[in-house]
């Protein structure tokens, strides 16, 4: 049986850091209030000339270096992003050009905070069916471009960054299953209400911002993530005690803690980066994975549960042997 196995990870965070104390000077908020409700202490913000593809490229090169792979080896590129460099071509095509990779399929996936899990699921299916042997899967965002920095309910949450993995065909166990879902009935609870075909002038003027009904999102997210955890465990016929690490989307420490309780996992078996990164949307899971791999927590053979929830609503999970 052919599996899709992660052989390299990479991450990239912009140099500029925005702390909670910095935000205290911008909006009516406090460091204590932000930490108590979100767990976030700081977030990274892209520079004026820094783009999503810039971050994606750095993360991708680091993942390829860890995997020992060159541009000639990559035969599929998928970038999960909500903040592409251009309307078209895709950020994946722009990344392909920078990496001097020619001819393979390259496309973007847009599932907001669930984007990386969606992209991982797509790449897994390519590899399992023989459509690819060495895929580059990236989650990259510059959410600071679509944050209203006068809205204290949202501007404290989000950060910029990119994470990447190299996924290769292998006889060894890798991705065991992915589970992808969406329900568009909840679109107005978390969204950017303006787009190219509905409000082009506002988009052009830079007036398209994230809007969120936080309490309602929280309630749906906690219940939905509980269900996706059950679905993943049941599908693979395993007990939660067998999972070595939970690597969740880094949205909010309270949501992360709720999912950990569902799995009966102590927080020291949960990879948490939301305090340092904020919510980087599609980048959060691969960034967290890269941090945990490079600091030695996640080791070969570990069983990992990834789960995410995002605008749409979208949600999903991946169970994999690292």
Curated annotation (Swiss-Prot):
Pathway info: Lipid metabolism; fatty acid biosynthesis
Enzyme class: transferase
Location(s) in or outside the cell: Cytoplasm
Gene3D superfamilies: 3.40.47.10
Keyword ATP-binding found: no
UniProt entry keywords in alphabetical sequence: Acyltransferase, Cytoplasm, Fatty acid biosynthesis, Fatty acid metabolism, Lipid biosynthesis, Lipid metabolism, Multifunctional enzyme, Transferase
InterPro entries reported in the protein's UniProt record: ACP_syn_III_C (IPR013747), ACP_syn_III_N (IPR013751), FabH (IPR004655), Thiolase-like (IPR016039)
Catalytic reaction annotation: malonyl-[ACP] + acetyl-CoA + H(+) = 3-oxobutanoyl-[ACP] + CO2 + CoA
One biological process term in Gene Ontology: fatty acid biosynthetic process
Pfam families: ACP_syn_III (PF08545), ACP_syn_III_C (PF08541)
GO molecular function, one term: 3-oxoacyl-[acyl-carrier-protein] synthase activity
Residues the record marks as active site: 113, 249, 279
UniProt KW Acyltransferase keyword: yes
GO cellular component, one term: cytoplasm
Region annotated ACP-binding, chain positions: 250-254
Domain notes: The last Arg residue of the ACP-binding site is essential for the weak association between ACP/AcpP and FabH.
Family: Belongs to the thiolase-like superfamily. FabH family.
Record's function text: Catalyzes the condensation reaction of fatty acid synthesis by the addition to an acyl acceptor of two carbons from malonyl-ACP. Catalyzes the first condensation reaction which initiates fatty acid synthesis and may therefore play a role in governing the total rate of fatty acid production. Possesses both acetoacetyl-ACP synthase and acetyl transacylase activities. Its substrate specificity determines the biosynthesis of branched-chain and/or straight-chain of fatty acids.
HAMAP family for the chain: FabH
The protein, known as: Beta-ketoacyl-[acyl-carrier-protein] synthase III
Protein's organism: Thioalkalivibrio sulfidiphilus (strain HL-EbGR7)
Lineage: Bacteria, Pseudomonadati, Pseudomonadota, Gammaproteobacteria, Chromatiales
